[in-house]
């Protein structure tokens, strides 16, 4: 049967999709004559009727209950082609039958190869966006699905990169992406002295992955001093929470500087004291930070000294849920509670 495309319209693609489904994937099975060709172009995953709206609207996940049939053979982590129920090609993503998130999309272009050039393009786009929008001295350079690199986070702390991988399919690309990012950064005169992996979150179990924590490449001093919003921090990328620091809270911390001058402030779950220190540097009269972790409190106190705020900003090891009723019973009052 002959099909002629008279423009890249939704209608013409729907017609094409129906031809594919009716004449190539008859009854959702592979004809022997087509098997070799389809295998070369990856497995085809067809969604149930009515599914796929999320992907068309910009989503990146396909759940197990959205899939109708899988035509072809694959292993977990392989890149597969995704079609809607009518055979319309929706793009490519990697598949993992161990996960409820069965497919994580990498591209919405069915004819796009997932190769080194593709990954470089994704990394370059991610870096270009950060250069346009944020202070890049320390920032989240790669943010998973938002950068079409699903399950992968790469944080930059000055001249150190910290990597967190939470998806099986991304494991095969992880070190290539790190190398490509170092190349992209070097083109802007940025030299990376070390890379550390913090893929130690429990979410990896859902992907059938073991936890990984350690150096990618040569070892280096993993205590990194960064400056954010005028506040200095010593970040421990090995023992700190997540990748060592909550970089995504940068502008929330900055907002504290606008409202805390001359105020009495209580910072709950202070971690490394980031919100408390932003309040202190803005001129708060008195700041108390609470955290249940002794290690976090020690880090927060060290950061207070680093910013010469130890006379104004104080930290205490306590369970916030126990401490708040005690403070209320004692009649303590605060202007700002974080």
Regions picked out by a protein language model, each given a short descriptive name:
Residues 5-8, 22-23, 28, 34-37:
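Intrinsic-disorder-associated, low-complexity terminal segments enriched in Asp/Asn/His/Tyr and depleted
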Residues 142-155, 174-245, 254:
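Non-catalytic substrate-recognition/targeting regions of SAM-dependent transferases
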Residues 35-158:
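Non-catalytic accessory regions of SAM-dependent methyltransferases
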Residues 214-338:
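Rossmann-like S-adenosyl-L-methionine
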Residues 3, 10-13:
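Tryptophan (W) side chains
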Residues 104-113, 162-174:
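Short histidine-centered catalytic/ligand-binding loop motif
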């Amino acid at each position: 049967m002959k099909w002629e495309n008279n423009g890249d319209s939704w209608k013409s693609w729907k017609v094409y999709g129906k031809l594919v489904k009716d004449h190539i994937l008859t009854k959702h099975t592979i004809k022997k004559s087509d098997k070799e060709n389809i295998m070369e172009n990856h497995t085809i995953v067809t969604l149930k009727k009515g599914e796929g709206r999320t992907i068309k609207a910009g989503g990146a996940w396909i759940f197990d209950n959205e899939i109708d049939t899988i035509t072809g053979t694959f292993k977990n982590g392989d890149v597969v082609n995704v079609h809607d129920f009518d055979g319309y090609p929706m793009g490519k993503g990697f598949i993992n039958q161990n996960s409820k998130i069965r497919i994580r999309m990498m591209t919405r272009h069915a004819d796009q190869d997932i190769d080194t050039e593709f990954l470089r393009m994704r990394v370059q786009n991610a870096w270009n966006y950060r250069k346009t929008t944020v202070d890049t001295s320390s920032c989240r350079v790669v943010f998973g699905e938002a950068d079409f690199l699903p399950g992968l986070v790469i944080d930059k702390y000055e001249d150190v990169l910290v990597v967190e991988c939470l998806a099986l399919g991304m494991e095969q690309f992880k070190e290539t992406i790190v190398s490509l990012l170092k190349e992209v950064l070097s083109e802007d005169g940025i030299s990376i002295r070390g890379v550390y992996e913090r893929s130690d979150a429990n979410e990896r179990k859902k992907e059938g992955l073991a936890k990984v924590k350690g150096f990618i490449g040569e070892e280096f001093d993993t205590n990194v001093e960064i400056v954010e919003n005028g506040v200095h921090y010593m970040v421990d990328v090995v023992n700190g929470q997540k990748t060592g620091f909550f970089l995504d809270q940068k502008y929330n911390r900055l907002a504290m500087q606008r409202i805390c001058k001359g105020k009495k402030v209580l910072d709950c779950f202070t971690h490394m004291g980031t919100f408390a220190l932003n309040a202190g540097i803005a001129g708060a009269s008195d700041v108390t930070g609470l955290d249940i972790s002794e290690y976090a409190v020690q880090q927060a106190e060290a950061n207070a000294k680093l910013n010469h705020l130890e006379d104004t900003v104080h930290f205490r090891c306590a369970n916030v849920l126990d401490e708040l009723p005690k403070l209320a019973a004692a009649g303590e009052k605060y202007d700002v509670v974080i």
